Design a protein with these regions (language model features):
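Alpha-helical segment proximal to the catalytic Tyr-Lys
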Residues: 130, 174-178, 234
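C-terminal substrate-recognition "lid" of short-chain dehydrogenase/reductases
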Residues: 122, 214-243, 248-249
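A glycine/serine/threonine-rich, flexible loop-to-helix segment
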Residues: 48, 178, 185-210
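Conserved glycine-rich cofactor-binding loop
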Residues: 8, 15-17, 39
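Active-site helix of classical SDR
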Residues: 125, 161, 169
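Substrate-binding pocket helix/loop in short-chain dehydrogenase/reductase
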Residues: 100-102, 106-114, 196, 206
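Residue(s) in the substrate-gating loop at a strand-loop-helix junction
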Residues: 145
Length: 250
């Protein structure tokens, strides 16, 4: 039996990059997957690809910077399309600004990063938890970053948002475990995706400092998410799982 057979998963920011890889991997493991992001055409292509491989997937277009009503609509439509309460939520979507000195961050950038990276996961999780509780439990996986653990110059805004998400993981894990809901974080290091292939030489150079000297791939992160979403991780709550080639270990 596939590890996520019969379960419903919502993966935010899944029209590209790590989110797309996670959504596709979950479908291969038997989950009913709801893909969401900006761009209906791209979303439809991903759904078509999953279905062509024998999986089940749906798409909901949603703007996570648009506030609570939009996020609650996403939760409702995802649940309706899945035909059951969402069992697995992957809070993957994030807004990333280019590295810059902290003195040059604008209020607009600060608001947008915190809106998408912290507020949206908070509201979406709150909207889906009641259904998980009613259905006997679930799994929430927050996509963190090693940038939310280590201090990295010129990325303080993004790092602060991810550190906030890491904190939510621990608090929610303590609060929701009694309801059968597990909350954990996956924290990728630099990862090559289809959208940053042009940065491969830089990412490979960074990987030379890792103990395993391996550049992260989407598949590396997706494997960690699948594990935490599965029953194999049934006794794991509130952890931060780095997928970074050992970078945080040194």
């Amino acid at each position: 039996m596939k590890r996520l057979e019969g379960r419903a998963a919502l993966v935010t920011g899944s029209t590209s990059g790590i989110g797309r890889g996670v959504a596709e991997a979950m479908a291969r493991e038997g989950a009913i997957v709801v893909v969401t992001g900006l761009g209906a055409e791209q979303g439809a292509q991903i759904v078509d690809g999953i279905v062509a491989e024998g999986g089940i997937a749906h798409f909901v277009e949603a703007d996570l910077s648009a506030g609570g009503s939009e996020i609650r609509r996403l939760a409702q439509e995802a649940t309706a399309l899945a035909g059951r309460p969402i069992d697995i939520l992957v809070n993957n979507a994030a807004f990333l600004v280019p590295p810059h000195p902290m003195t040059e961050s604008t209020e607009e950038q600060i608001d947008l990063v915190l809106e998408v990276n912290v507020k949206a996961p908070y509201l979406l999780t709150a909207a889906l938890v009641p259904g998980m509780v009613e259905h006997g439990g679930g799994s929430v996986i927050n996509m963190g970053s090693i940038g939310g653990v280590d201090g990295i110059k010129f990325t303080s805004l993004y790092g602060a948002s991810k550190a906030g998400l890491h904190s939510l993981t621990r608090s929610w894990a303590a609060e929701l475990a009694a309801d059968g809901i597990r909350v954990n974080t996956v924290a990728p290091g630099p990862t090559i995706t289809e959208s940053n292939e042009d940065l491969r030489p830089i990412l490979e150079k960074l990987a030379e400092n890792n103990p395993d000297r391996h550049t992260g791939t989407v598949q590396d992160t997706a494997a960690a998410v699948i594990f935490l979403a599965s029953e194999e991780a049934s006794h794991i709550h509130g952890v931060l799982l780095p997928v970074d080639g050992g970078a945080l270990a040194i």
